[in-house]
């Protein structure tokens, strides 16, 4: 998917700044939607156990998209390197997550 992003950006003249700005808008909108409960019917709460720093197990419920980054900025995105093509413009901050998906 990252290489395709690079190819599309090159073909249509989409700059790194444009990609970063869109990433900020997307995460901001997603954060607002999640905060207002718009995703509640799309995310099934999953109880699980996690270990804390001391190795203690705690039960938690995963009920939100953890990929939303509401605090990203142009400055923070500018620090990330292109990862799919040398001299490219697609970074971990403006690309789609590779961890998306679920199984039932």
Report the location of each language-model feature.
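Conserved thiamine diphosphate
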Residues: 1-24
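N-terminal extracellular/periplasmic Venus flytrap/periplasmic-binding protein-like
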Residues: 18-104
